[in-house]
Amino acid sequence: MISILLLIAAQSASTRLPPARALPPPTGDEQAVLNSANALLSAFNTGNPVEVLRWVYPDGRVTGTGTLPSRSGVRSESWAQFTQRLGNSAFQETISDPAVEVDGDAAMVWAPFVVRIGGKVSNCGFDHFDLVRENGIWKTMNLTFSSRITRCPAQ
């Protein structure tokens, strides 16, 4: 019986992954990355398609998964398609407690968000911005988010 347990333990030990390597040390660009993501959110909140397109790469995508008040599942569209739906000044999205990672000219922001429409919580989830720096300017390539209509803060 003990030999069987030792054999099982040996097999499970051999399938473990090696420890993850730590990310490079912070470069000091985290605030610039966060400023870019916040500028994009500000453009969403004012419903300004021109300003949104200023902070993104046109070839990027907006992809959502989960539940919204009107639909569920995976949704994906270009930034141009996304901006065509802007204009509702009652829409307000906020993020909190962002995690920012930077490696050279690539970065990401991961943060919980809450969307309010007319001051009432509509949905919440997590945003994942992936950003690229070109000519010293951080722009969002893609925004991917989860969404739910229950268990949201202040709901």
Locations of regions flagged by a protein language model:
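Sec-dependent N-terminal signal peptides of Gram-negative exported proteins
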Residues: 1-13
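Short, low-complexity N-terminal intrinsically disordered segments enriched in polar/charged residues
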Residues: 11-50, 54, 58
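Short beta-strand edge/turn micro-motifs at domain boundaries
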Residues: 17, 108, 124-151
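Surface-exposed, charged secondary-structure patches
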Residues: 32, 61, 73-122
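N-terminal, post-signal-peptide region of Sec/Tat-exported proteins
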Residues: 42-81
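Solvent-exposed loop/turn segments at secondary-structure junctions
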Residues: 49, 59-62, 115-117, 146-150
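A mature extracytoplasmic/lumenal domain signature
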Residues: 56-59, 66-68, 113, 127, ...
